[in-house]
Curated annotation (Swiss-Prot):
Entry's localization field: Cytoplasm
Cofactor note: Binds 1 divalent metal cation per subunit. Can use either Co(2+) or Zn(2+).
Pfam families: DHQ_synthase (PF01761), DHQS_C (PF24621)
CDD domains membership: DHQS
Cellular component, GO, one term: cytoplasm
HAMAP family in the cross-refs: DHQ_synthase (MF_00110)
Residues where Zn(2+) binds: E188, H251, H267
Keywords: Amino-acid biosynthesis, Aromatic amino acid biosynthesis, Cobalt, Cytoplasm, Lyase, Metal-binding, NAD, Nucleotide-binding, Zinc
Entries under SUPFAM superfamilies matching the protein: Dehydroquinate synthase-like
Gene: aroB
Binding-site residues for NAD(+), renumbered to this chain: 75-80, 109-113, 133-134, 146, 155, 173-176
Domain of life: Bacteria
GO aspect biological process, one term: amino acid biosynthetic process
Name this protein carries in UniProt: 3-dehydroquinate synthase
Length: 363
């Protein structure tokens, strides 16, 4: 087993926004060194399910001389609400956190989204370090500086761009991750393959079992490749003014499914259906070949991810898609493919086109 660490660099609009994503094993103990000497107080934000891990990180920081506290938040999307952010702000205020102090996020993508938002807004910005413990968190949410919380109107509608000081992707944390969470995270991995790195798709197709084995070198390579794709994109376009939109492949319908399901669906499962829909949409307008569209289905189904959704939910999905951040006026905008690793944008003024494409994924 590879015991060394891989460092993937993310560059920002200035040197102050540059940071490293470290992928390896046994990384939890490196946190004190990364925090540095100026930091005195650290708030460790973690979900209920990771109470023991959060306490371990806190104790390690205390042993290293920091004043460390924990803030336990609800699991998954339930933690991404303004009331939860307000609770974290209260903890920071009551313990006199200053701009030279720091927040550490320990958990999946929802935790890094929430913790990043709290860090971006407390005193207009304090240091945050992400320690993702899920596959989805490692390859997507923790990298790129996007933070956000949900509202009743949609997902991630309130947020800020706030790059982390570092990301520690400790592969040891995947050993106890439930298999369905690994499978969900693979949706974001193969997304990176479809939009930018065909080698990801080839690795998946070669051995479907290995890609969901937390101890396999195949999974590690997939994680590093997916992070590298995202790092390259966000280094060129931090604030989603153009290129970064391609990372939303599958997310327009995916976020709408999450909204309709009141976040009971896993993010990766929703994005999987969203990618299948985007492939059918691109096929219907002649931009994606039959072979590439069918490849979506075979890869996603091979991983155990869903590729269909309920036929009777179309109107709710359409309403949800109209709230998508990529929309411009009355135009719905979709990231589509003109081929593998050839992403583009499709503006759709006529919803009948969307309805027809949806029939190909409706069940």
């Amino acid at each position: 087993m590879n015991t060394s660490s891989t460092v993937i660099k993310v560059t920002g609009e200035s040197a102050a926004n540059n940071y490293d994503v470290v992928v390896g094993r046994g990384l939890l103990g490196t946190l004190p060194e990364i925090l540095g000497e100026r930091v005195r107080r650290v708030l460790v934000i973690h979900p209920r399910a990771l109470r023991l891990t959060g306490d371990t990180v806190r104790d390690d920081l205390e042993s290293a001389g920091f004043t460390a506290l924990t803030a336990e938040i609800p699991d998954a999307e339930e933690g991404k609400h303004i009331q939860v952010a307000a609770f974290c702000w209260q903890v920071l205020g009551q313990n006199d956190f200053t701009r030279s102090d720091a927040i550490v996020a320990v958990g999946g993508g929802a935790v890094t989204d929430l913790a990043g938002f709290v860090a971006a807004t407390w005193l207009r910005g304090v240091k945050v370090i992400h320690m993702p413990t899920s596959l989805l968190g490692m390859v997507d949410a923790s990298v790129g500086g996007k933070t956000g919380i949900n509202t009743a109107e949609g997902k991630n509608l309130v947020g800020a761009f706030h790059p982390p000081a570092a990301v520690l992707a400790d592969l040891d944390t995947l050993d106890t991750l439930p298999r369905n969470e690994l499978i969900s995270g693979m949706a974001e991995v193969v997304k990176c393959g479809f939009i930018a790195d065909p080698a990801i798709l080839e690795l998946v197709e070669k051995d479907f079992a290995a890609v969901t084995d937390p101890r396999s070198e195949t999974l590690r390579e997939l994680i590093e490749r997916a992070i590298a794709v995202k790092a390259k994109v966000v280094s060129e376009d931090l604030k989603e003014s153009g290129l970064r939109e391609i990372l939303n492949y599958g997310h327009t319908l995916g976020h709408a499914i999450e909204l309709v399901e009141r976040y009971s669906w896993r993010h990766g499962a929703a994005v999987s259906v969203g990618m299948m829909f985007a492939a059918e949409l691109a096929r219907s307008v002649g931009r994606l070949s039959d072979a590439d569209a069918d490849r979506h289905r075979s890869i996603l189904e091979g991983l155990g991810l869903p590729v269909t959704y309920r036929r009777d939910r179309w109107q709710g999905l359409l309403d949800g898609m109209r709230r998508d951040k990529k929309s411009r006026g009355d135009l719905l905008r979709f990231v589509v493919l003109d081929g593998v690793a050839k992403p583009g944008i499709l503006d759709v003024p006529d919803t009948s086109l969307l309805f027809a494409a949806y029939q190909e994924v409706a069940s």
